[in-house]
Amino acid sequence: MMRIALGIQYDGAAFCGWQSQPHGKTVQDALERSLAEFAQTSLHTTVAGRTDTGVHGLGQVVHFDTDLDRADFSWVRGTNAFLPPTVAVQWAKPMPDTFHARFAAFERTYYYALYVHPVRSPMLAGRAGWVHTPLDVDAMREAAAHLVGEHDFSAFRSSECQAKSPVKHLYQIGIRPDGDFIHFRFRANAFLHHMVRNLMGCLVAVGRGRYPSSWLAEVLESRDRDCAAPTFMPEGLYLAHVGYPAEFAVPPAQLGSVPWSSVWADLDGRT
């Protein structure tokens, strides 16, 4: 039995999230149908992190076990031949049994692209979040500083979250304006369900001047979801990177397919 890892990219706007559903309109369903067509047998995938409806994947990683012996490029080309244009396998790599797409990962990175303009842009539909009023970037940075570190993030988890512990280590929140956009980078050991979107909702509320920067510390301390802002829209959220120990030599995510990749590359915590 061989363990194969795949790197996946997908347009989240085209699917009802990652996790398989009876209606079959999820990324996992599309991927497993295509793998079955290519391999002529059912293959079950395990994913690094489940994404919600509308959330995009640039650096998603899955693994599956199989008796089939195929070349790496064969898994890529063969599976892609049966996938819709909104999802594609980027790479395939044999892995040792010690590799696990979810449990071997030690960090995840999400980016959020936010369009700030009085009028929404149809060209950005499904690609970026949108607010119509200016935001105070310095206030959002001050607020974000209260969240970095190891904390109980219960105030930012959804009621449907199945995580065993609400304690996560948030390594970085980077915020950088770029013309009519503000880009956010969230890097942590793991995230709770809706955690990034709930953090975004609170940061935007601070940026709009509805709350002072210190409010985020109060929300965090409360551990109460009702104290935080509403969950922000999913459209601008991208799972960009999943980190694994060097021994697995997981290929890096290809971010060049998004127009903001050069801006994201500069989001290193000093901005």
From Swiss-Prot:
Keyword field contains Iron: no
GO biological process, one term: tRNA pseudouridine synthesis
Tree of life domain: Bacteria
Positions contributing to substrate binding: Y110
EC number: 5.4.99.12
The keyword tRNA processing appears for this protein: yes
Catalyzed chemical reaction(s): uridine(38/39/40) in tRNA = pseudouridine(38/39/40) in tRNA
Keywords: Isomerase, tRNA processing
GO MF entries: RNA binding; tRNA pseudouridine(38-40) synthase activity
Active site: D52
InterPro entries registered for this protein in UniProt: PsdUridine_synth_cat_dom_sf, PsdUridine_synth_TruA, PsdUridine_synth_TruA_a/b_dom, PsdUridine_synth_TruA_C, TruA/RsuA/RluB/E/F_N
Function: Formation of pseudouridine at positions 38, 39 and 40 in the anticodon stem and loop of transfer RNAs.
UniProt subunit comment: Homodimer.
Protein name: tRNA pseudouridine synthase A
